[in-house]
Amino acid sequence: MLLTLGFGAGAQKIVHLNRYAEANAALPPANGPRVVLYGDSITDGWPRQRPEFFASTGFIGRGISGEETAQMLLRFRADVIDIGATVMVFLGGINDIAQNMGDPYVEDVTYANILSMIDLCWQNGIRPVICGLLPSYYIRWRTEVTDSFEKVCSLNARLKAYCERHGVTYIDYGRVLAGPDGKILKDYSGDTVHPNAAGYERMEKLLLDSLK
């Protein structure tokens, strides 16, 4: 099922509710903790670049390239709750800053969408783990957004503060991906948004340490 969002006039207003329908239906019953990585293209591309990580951990990837947080919120039940997740690791928001749906970026809206997903986790006995946005500083498909790094830092600061107040695990991938200026190093991302295999490998270690 494709759901068209009925607000704004942007280019990408589709929620791909059936993207993972077959994969979800094929999942065996969970016989232990079920960790779902949830997000956008960064999560979507992770299993392709580092399939051995998912094979060794049993983690489930449910990312969709290009999605904003509003789209992720709409498919949250199908791709997190209904597949029996016990832990949800969220990484998203850069496409909100990139205005992928064509609407102006409003930090309060993105922040509220993420908090709504945290609330859904708590209501369904799922442990939420929130990842800060990667410290991107150039969005190649939206070059007119010249302050992406500042917007990333601002949203991350709010998410980190919320997590600290409410006892939610917060993962700062910038710790292992950024240089002295706080921006992602080209050693770990060719376009400053999406990690390469080396970047994912560094993220994996921090993720596993954070889930202990």
Question: Where do the PLM segments sit?
Answer:
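Amphipathic, non-transmembrane alpha-helical secondary structure
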Residues: 70-81, 108-115, 119, 201, ...
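Catalytic His-Asp segment of secreted/periplasmic serine-dependent ester chemistry enzymes
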Residues: 3, 134-212
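Metal-dependent catalytic neighborhoods of phosphoester/phosphodiester hydrolases
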Residues: 49, 100-106, 133, 141
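Cell-envelope and extracellular/periplasmic
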Residues: 62-65, 92-93, 97, 101-102
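Serine-esterase "nucleophile elbow" of acetyl-processing enzymes
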Residues: 8-89
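Active-site flanking residues adjacent to catalytic metal/cofactor-binding acidic residues
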Residues: 38-40, 92, 131, 171
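Active-site segments of SGNH/GDSL-like serine hydrolases
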Residues: 91-97, 118-152
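Charged helix-capping and loop-helix junction motifs
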Residues: 105-115, 149-155
